A protein has these predicted regions:
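Hydrophobic anchor at the beta1->P-loop junction of P-loop NTPases
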Residues: 7
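P-loop (Walker A) phosphate-binding loop of NTP-binding proteins
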Residues: 10
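ATP-binding Walker
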Residues: 13
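Walker A/P-loop
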Residues: 16
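Conserved substrate/cofactor phosphate-moiety recognition/catalytic segment
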Residues: 20-66
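Glycine-rich phosphate-binding loop used to anchor ATP phosphates in small-molecule kinases
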Residues: 52-94
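Conserved phosphate-donor/acceptor-positioning beta-strand/loop module used by diverse small-molecule
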Residues: 93-112
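Small-molecule kinase domains that catalyze NTP-dependent phosphoryl transfer to phosphate-bearing small molecules
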Residues: 115-159, 165
Length: 165
């Protein structure tokens, strides 16, 4: 049965590292849909309402659903732009949906970003400009990672949650 895991949060919070760790752990049968790859690399789209990455992300997730894959949707996915698409995916996958949000302080995201290999790609000033505080979906099943949650703790939590659905 297909399962959907949505991992959201501000730039530099650890979403990509977590999603890649999940994909490595589960291996074949896992579809990782990274917002940066779809929006920026594949389509060269801007972050704006109606951008083509919304439909492509949904289509890829539907492919995963049709093929009974574990679908990992990872990215910033600002609610004012992406909430309708995420709601449709939630409806499609039903109770096989898990959603997580990195609810970190700005200072923690900067600290995490400074440990990354790609830290030169954008600055703390860029991060501040893009920052959206507590951009929650408002779903009952949405869970949160806080400053004190390590990559390993977040990973273990999702693995345990997946075993329950």
């Amino acid at each position: 049965m297909a399962k959907l895991v949505i991992i959201r949060g501000n730039s530099g919070s650890g979403k990509s590292s977590l999603a890649k760790k999940m994909q490595t752990h589960y291996g074949r049968g896992t579809l990782l849909i990274a917002q940066d790859t779809v929006r920026r690399d594949m389509l060269k789209e801007k972050v704006e309402p109606g951008n083509l990455s919304i439909d492509l992300t949904e289509s890829l997730a539907c492919f995963g659903y049709e093929h009974d894959l574990l679908v990992l949707v990872e990215g910033f996915y600002e609610t004012d732009i992406y909430c309708h698409m995420l709601e449709r995916l939630r409806t499609l996958f039903g109770p096989q949906t898990l959603a997580y949000y990195y609810d970190l302080t700005f200072e923690e995201t900067v600290s995490r970003h400074q440990t990354r290999a790609k830290q030169e790609e954008f600055t703390p000033a860029d991060m501040k400009r893009w920052w959206k505080d507590r951009d929650f979906l408002g779903w009952q099943e949405e869970s949160f990672f806080r400053d004190e949650d390590s990559l390993e703790a977040a990973f273990e939590r999702i693995v345990q949650d997946l075993e329950k659905i």
